[in-house]
Every structure is written in structure tokens, then in C-alpha cells.
């Protein structure tokens, strides 16, 4: 009985080893060093050289100012026309008041009823201030 357990344990270890090795990525091996050298020299020549230039304080300030101008222009162009908010429902629940499902809707059109603890504690909350 001990021999069969030993045989089964060995078989299990071999299966684990082959399973793990079959999932590993295969390694790429070059056939000769000449192809490796030619590939590395070709790759270096393909890319342009990089030069590093130190910026002084004045150029940093100018670039920061230009960036602020560009961002303000983008914000001005991206602003949408203010859409009118939908009217409030007549009987409604104020923010941070209880709004369990049989209760009425929230007064703020940007608010919604958020429930916690398996819908035992519900309240109207505004999570998107830009609404």
C-alpha cells in the first residue's frame, strides 16, 4: 500500500511539473551571434538620437503661462450651454432626509436616493456637484 501511495505521489508531482512548464512562455534563442549583432546594430540606427536640454526658470515660467492660456482656451471651448434643470417634483424629500423606496422623490434634480445596510438606511445625496 505504501508503494502505491509513493507511485501516485510521484505521478502527481510529475503532472504538476508538466502542467506548470507547459504554461510558461517559450524563450527565444538565436542560432548564431552574428544575427544577434546585426539585429542590435539595426535597432540602434533606426531610432533618432535624444538630446537633453536644461530649462532655466524664465523658460519654465513662460511655458507654465502658455499652458495655462491653452487650458483656459480649451475650457472655454468645451463649456456647454447651460441646460435648464428639470422642475422639482411637488411633494419631495430634502437632501440628507430619509427616502426609503415607498417615499417620494428627492427635491434636488441632481440628487438620488442612496441606500445602505440592506436598504435599512436611505437618504437623498448629491454626488455630482457639476450636475
UniProtKB/Swiss-Prot annotation:
Signal recorded as keyword: yes
Signal peptide (residue range): 1-22
Protein's GO biological process: adult feeding behavior; epigenetic programming in the zygotic pronuclei; generation of precursor metabolites and energy; hormone-mediated signaling pathway; melanin biosynthetic process; melanosome organization; melanosome transport; positive regulation of melanin biosynthetic process
Domain of life assignment: Eukaryota
Disulfide pattern: 92-107, 99-113, 106-124, 110-131, 115-122
Pfam families per UniProt: Agouti
Keyword check for Secreted: yes
Subcellular location: Secreted
Agouti domain: residues covered: 92-131
Record's keyword terms, sorted: Disulfide bond, Glycoprotein, Knottin, Secreted, Signal
Glycosylation sites: 39
Domain notes: The presence of a 'disulfide through disulfide knot' structurally defines this protein as a knottin.
Function field: Involved in the regulation of melanogenesis. The binding of ASP to MC1R precludes alpha-MSH initiated signaling and thus blocks production of cAMP, leading to a down-regulation of eumelanogenesis (brown/black pigment) and thus increasing synthesis of pheomelanin (yellow/red pigment).
Protein name in UniProt: Agouti-signaling protein
Amino acid at each position: 500500500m505504501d508503494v502505491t501511495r509513493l507511485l501516485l505521489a510521484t505521478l502527481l508531482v510529475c503532472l504538476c511539473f508538466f502542467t506548470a512548464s507547459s504554461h510558461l512562455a517559450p524563450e527565444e534563442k538565436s542560432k548564431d551571434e552574428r544575427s544577434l549583432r546585426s539585429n542590435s546594430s539595426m535597432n540602434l540606427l533606426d531610432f533618432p538620437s535624444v538630446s537633453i536640454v536644461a530649462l532655466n526658470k524664465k523658460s519654465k515660467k513662460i511655458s507654465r503661462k502658455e499652458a495655462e492660456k491653452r487650458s483656459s482656451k480649451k475650457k472655454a471651448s468645451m463649456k456647454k450651454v447651460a441646460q435648464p434643470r428639470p422642475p422639482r417634483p411637488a411633494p419631495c424629500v430634502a437632501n440628507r432626509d430619509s427616502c426609503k423606496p415607498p417615499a417620494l422623490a428627492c427635491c434636488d434634480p441632481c440628487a438620488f436616493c442612496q441606500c445602505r445596510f440592506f436598504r435599512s438606511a436611505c437618504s437623498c445625496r448629491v454626488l455630482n456637484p457639476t450636475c
